[in-house]
């Protein structure tokens, strides 16, 4: 563990929780996909989860299980080939549930597919597009404002296809047989 991340005298449980969070944080996960499965597998090391999967298209009350989304890589490059945005460095940079894309776009088109938080100019927002097929990136407002006119290469290596919604169930035995 890096020194200085936790105060002296912090309990072992707190240290373990912190290490678990450090392990889980980098995993890109959404409501479906391999990131959810990877997260649940790690959590199974700590608690006995029962894993369930529901196929895409299944109706559950007033909701339909969406297609499964997985992402492998994404970036924005400038005309010189420099990566300005890199999913491998920060998975917040991709609009969650983005469709795959690999093309060159103008700054105006890029801006039309970019989410920012002008009121928090140095924050990268978390945005999703579960129910409207689209592609996009999330940048800090400052970073977007610094982009010059020109052509940009946008690349998102993702898939959106029939699959499953995966979830974990953990049963905590109580003092009565009631369940909620």
Give residue ranges: language-model regions:
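N-terminal hydrophobic/helix-forming segments and targeting peptides
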Residues: 1-180
